């Protein structure tokens, strides 16, 4: 890691169907081995399934799901003397989004539906209704931060 300059953030282009930057980031996270067209078909297929099931805008369901999964606080390890403390810290907005996307995808991959499109749509629907393993992951992180609130004065 360079000590002089931190890498500058790259501009992410909005996706062609919805014109949304977050959807593009989501696609890029789903993508394996540079196969963007496969990732695109999975995401768009999942959003089409959501639209068919709920009769409401798939973008609103997606945004609600992401909002319900994004953590506001997390714990980070801090060594003080000989002891390591789990110190609760607030999560930056870019990291919140990245963690939310990562947790949604991990939860979708762990589901039992047949295709990834079905798994992703089911997980997004669950997350938008505050259910599912991605939301559980966020609650676990928040519980951990709440349990270690006593060490919040070690914040840096």
From Swiss-Prot:
Disulfide bonds: none annotated. GO terms for molecular function: rRNA binding; structural constituent of ribosome; tRNA binding. The keyword Methyltransferase does not apply. Keywords: Ribonucleoprotein, Ribosomal protein, RNA-binding, rRNA-binding, tRNA-binding. GO terms for cellular component: small ribosomal subunit. SUPFAM superfamilies: Ribosomal protein S7 (SSF47973). GO terms for biological process: translation. Part of the 30S ribosomal subunit. Contacts proteins S9 and S11. Belongs to the universal ribosomal protein uS7 family. One of the primary rRNA binding proteins, it binds directly to 16S rRNA where it nucleates assembly of the head domain of the 30S subunit. Is located at the subunit interface close to the decoding center, probably blocks exit of the E-site tRNA. This is Small ribosomal subunit protein uS7. It comes from Nitrobacter winogradskyi (strain ATCC 25391 / DSM 10237 / CIP 104748 / NCIMB 11846 / Nb-255). The gene is rpsG.
């Amino acid at each position: 890691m360079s000590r002089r300059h931190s890498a500058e953030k790259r501009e992410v282009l909005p996706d062609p169907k919805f014109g949304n930057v977050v959807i593009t980031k989501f696609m890029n996270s789903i993508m394996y081995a540079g196969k963007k067209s496969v990732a695109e078909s999975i995401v768009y297929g999942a959003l089409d399934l959501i639209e068919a099931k709920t009769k409401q805008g798939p973008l609103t369901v997606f945004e609600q799901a992401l909002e319900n999964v994004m953590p506001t606080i997390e714990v980070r390890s801090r060594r003080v003397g000989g002891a390591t403390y789990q110190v609760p810290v607030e999560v930056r907005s870019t990291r919140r989004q990245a963690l939310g996307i990562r947790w949604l995808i991990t939860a979708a991959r762990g589901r039992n539906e047949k295709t990834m499109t079905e798994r992703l749509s089911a997980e997004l629907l669950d997350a938008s209704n505050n259910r599912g393993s991605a939301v559980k992951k966020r609650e676990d992180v928040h519980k951990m931060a709440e349990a270690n609130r006593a060490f919040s004065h070690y914040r840096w």
